[in-house]
């Protein structure tokens, strides 16, 4: 059975192809998209019904031809046409296969789902007439390459972008509103569905409510007067960084799907029931989950082709180049997440082989090389099987375990890279040998071939040299930090001279003057008694990479990352996050209250969110402005354009994950008579949330952070960024 056809399954419950994001097709930004058909034969049916009967260019291809899907790079029924042929591409003339911007066509036979009824069903050819405003360009038109101008080429690329975006939004809808919703309704635990689908809901809302409507309006309505794509992509490209979280979780999600399919009959029944529906296109859940992983590179390829055909003096040139930079950054962000997960997977595999003998699963560790090797006995020259694991900071010398299950290797020697030396030797009775010398032991090893020996020697030498360079850099950095380290005493406390502690000129038993030595000793004793970790993040201090600082308002010891807030524009005014949010942004005078009194008079700070966040804390949430519930709000660093609202505390379940792009922030009207003070409204489409902070200062901090995130600029405040306006005749709290 070809992927372009699907069998009928009337006994299965039909699933709506698109969810209802608003009250109707006209009230939702996806109104036009909701009118589009879904399914492998839907587009062909509509196309054939509207085409003339004698037009051979619109006929379906033979059953042996595969349907290319430019969105995912593999053959699937998501393509709206049976065969695409771009006349403006250099390879279109005389080519038996469609030219799709150089993307290879792959098969998806492994992802097919067997149907109960193997009989193929012919397309009926009956369907709704397509909307002329959203009718895509049909590349089957017989236009030669010489007749296709540059503006037409750009229009073809823009229409291809719109076409693939519409198909992609349907896939996202299928994942979020069909698979995830049905599994939740079937009673699958929330942590399982969250682990499988990650932040797919935020990705779906971004594309369905913002990117797709912008592209539809520009390409179908405004292209004749404003033929541009760069301004839209430049505005929305920063939000593509949210794909990093999905990509990083992808392997774990695949494992959860496989595990729950095998162990839970209910989970398996729900998945198989959906996969048999026409809306699923005869493809598995795993196939659809791969779409977001491949989407950002597709944008990059399309935009590169767009820039290649865009004239140098075009008005859209600058915006398009900037958009390509932002999309490439988002792609690099996803690739970095993939590489990080692959590195951790390698460490986990080694950890399992060693039976947990060595704690090597650490983001700072990196596996450089591993392999089996022979060890030469110093007594009789016999060889013994051994295994080497070379990391960036240590080498593990292991022996095989003689057991069928469980641990495969045991660590015989752990050799630090800083003390490691490698030497090539030539022995008449043993070829391909070299010696590794450590602090406690020397090993004479033998490889199978001379090339393998040279490779081990080169890799070990390069690893040792790189480790030495890093150590020298850390030592230099540590010396610079020691010179620039700030005093640990608060500026409010007077610095006592040594003469006030002991009379000047009083000698110790050895005849020396103990003034300076006494102060050094007391400073060291005080530091030893302090907590070893930061008050805010809890990370342990060290003398090189994690220096300690003291908050100038509350006096608590904090790290450099948690003391980036300043009460005034000077280095001597570092304060912690809690004091920065609650205290006036002016340094305390010597005659004011002591730091202890300031800490007692200040309101209770919010507990620290264990996840890295741009801003987090406790807020009150209401859906109607009358009933309020306490929630934990956070703007995560990994997804800075999303506001997460959790029930109760940071350990509670996720209530809302609100994409901040396109949101509006307003102040409530006094006539509403809200019970909670320091409140504001957050609008997204037709939905409104009422939020309230404990104090006016915290309210201003939240408004500033939300206003920055709404404009997609989390690196800093943009000049001229709009702030929420209060209703006329009222004062902003």
Curated annotation (Swiss-Prot):
Detected in adult brain, spleen, lung and skeletal muscle. Detected in embryos from 7 dpc to 17 dpc. Zn(2+) 2 binds at residues 551, 554, 576, 579. GO terms for molecular function: guanyl-nucleotide exchange factor activity; zinc ion binding. The keyword Metal-binding applies. A zinc finger (FYVE-type) spans 528-584. Keywords: Cytoplasm, Cytoskeleton, Guanine-nucleotide releasing factor, Metal-binding, Phosphoprotein, Repeat, Zinc, Zinc-finger. Zn(2+) 1 binds at residues 534, 537, 559, 562. GO terms for biological process: filopodium assembly. Residues 153-337 form the DH domain. Residues 1-134, 481-535, 586-612, 712-733 are annotated as: Disordered. Residues 517-533 have a biased composition (Basic and acidic residues). The modification Phosphothreonine is found at residue 732. Disulfide bonds: none annotated. Its main location: cytoplasm. Residues 1-11, 47-60, 106-117 have a biased composition (Polar residues). GO terms for cellular component: cytoplasm; cytoskeleton. The modification Phosphoserine is found at residue 124. Promotes the formation of filopodia. May activate CDC42, a member of the Ras-like family of Rho- and Rac proteins, by exchanging bound GDP for free GTP. Plays a role in regulating the actin cytoskeleton and cell shape. This is FYVE, RhoGEF and PH domain-containing protein 3. The lineage of its organism: Eukaryota, Metazoa, Chordata, Craniata, Vertebrata.
